[in-house]
């Protein structure tokens, strides 16, 4: 498209050039659009192929022209032209503006009757065949509601009423009421037909959420079983594990005869006293054995065999967990004393 001449000069104080400078050479060749085939200026000047405008103007009656000229309501194009006229330069006089207003009315009458432009005249649009209207206007739900109620049909905005569609199914598919939708066969995939135009259903197939939740539940069950098993072990643990009671060390004397005498005195103690007081006779510690010497090995072996027999008979660990739980702890007998003053040098706690 060729570049138009500059309408405004570079100087700020210079006035806008007159529109008389516009010529037909400024209009480009037709490019497939009706806007490039002709031009109608604001002052009534027209360029290009305007034969259809003149033919329409000749066919119009004098009465229709008088009614349109004397109408109080101006057309849509005349309003636009008047609004654009206000944005023009203020330096023009009132006389020039009056001439412009008169030419605007004339040009509006010409353009109003153009076939390529929208219908602006209600009388001419009413005379047109209603079959040329789009199908959405002829099958509007407003018309259907009026026809169903038996009331008068309300005319459309352009004053035309469309013909009734013979096929109701096609009419519904094009544009119709929400309550009268055709019944569609059910799809084998389980999709439901939307009850409203604004709603729809989407089926994304089987979901993996069920598998994920089942795996999570299995993990939770395994952790709970482990916790229960651990708690059962903790409950049985203290009963099955026997804590080591305070050790009663028997320090053998330097002489073998004295050690035998002290061992006889220790063996004469009643077994229930050993059990009640929580004492256990064990073998002498390695430090004491090293300090005494090698002559005490025979006494220590006999002492360990005796203590093992006592533990097997009297220890609560060999009774079983049920008997241990049933037997209450017994307080030590304060009146009974198995340590004499003579044995304090030989037996010590």
Curated annotation (Swiss-Prot):
Phosphoserine PTM sites in chain numbering: 18, 64, 103, 107, 116, 136, 138, 140, 154, 165, 223, 285, 288
Domain CRIB: 27-41
Superkingdom per UniProt: Eukaryota
Regions that span the bilayer: none
Keyword vocabulary terms for this entry: Cell shape, Cytoplasm, Cytoskeleton, Membrane, Methylation, Phosphoprotein
PROSITE patterns on file: CRIB
Keyword Phosphoprotein: yes
GO cellular component assignments: actin cytoskeleton; adherens junction; cytoplasm; endomembrane system; microtubule cytoskeleton; phagocytic vesicle; plasma membrane
Its biological purpose: Probably involved in the organization of the actin cytoskeleton. May act downstream of CDC42 to induce actin filament assembly leading to cell shape changes. Induces pseudopodia formation, when overexpressed in fibroblasts.
Family: Belongs to the BORG/CEP family.
Protein name per UniProt: Cdc42 effector protein 4
Native source organism of the sequence: Mus musculus
């Amino acid at each position: 498209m060729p570049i138009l001449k500059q309408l405004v000069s570079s100087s700020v104080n210079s006035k806008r050039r007159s529109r008389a400078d516009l010529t037909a050479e400024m209009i480009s060749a037709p490019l497939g659009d009706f806007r490039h085939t002709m031009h109608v200026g604001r002052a009534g000047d027209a360029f290009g192929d305007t034969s259809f405008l003149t033919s329409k103007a000749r066919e119009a009656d004098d009465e229709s022209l008088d009614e349109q000229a004397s109408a109080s309501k101006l057309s849509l194009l005349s309003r636009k032209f008047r609004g654009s006229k206000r944005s023009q330069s203020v330096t023009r006089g009132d006389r020039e503006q009056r001439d412009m207003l008169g030419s605007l009315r004339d040009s509006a009458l010409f353009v109003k009757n153009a076939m390529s432009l929208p219908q602006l005249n209600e009388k001419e649009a009413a005379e047109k065949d209603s079959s040329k209207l789009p199908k959405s206007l002829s099958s509007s739900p407003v018309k259907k509601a009026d026809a169903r109620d038996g009331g008068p049909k309300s005319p459309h905005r352009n004053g035309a009423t469309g013909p009734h569609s013979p096929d109701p199914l096609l009419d519904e598919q094009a544009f119709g009421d929400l309550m009268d939708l055709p019944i569609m066969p059910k799809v084998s995939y389980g999709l439901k037909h939307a009850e409203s135009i604004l709603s729809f259903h989407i089926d994304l197939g089987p979901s993996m959420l069920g598998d994920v939740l089942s795996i999570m539940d299995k993990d939770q069950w395994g952790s709970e079983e482990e916790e229960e098993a651990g708690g059962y072990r903790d409950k049985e643990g203290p009963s099955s594990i026997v804590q080591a009671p305070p050790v009663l060390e028997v320090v053998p004397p330097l002489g073998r005869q004295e050690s035998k005498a002290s061992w006889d005195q220790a063996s004469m103690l009643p077994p229930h006293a050993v059990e009640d007081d929580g004492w256990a006779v064990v073998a002498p510690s390695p430090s004491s054995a090293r300090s005494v010497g090698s002559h005490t090995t025979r006494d220590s072996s006999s002492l360990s065999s005796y203590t093992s027999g006592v533990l097997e008979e009297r220890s609560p660990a060999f009774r079983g967990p049920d008997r241990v739980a049933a037997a209450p702890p017994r307080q030590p007998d304060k009146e009974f004393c198995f340590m004499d003053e003579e044995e304090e040098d030989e037996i010590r706690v």
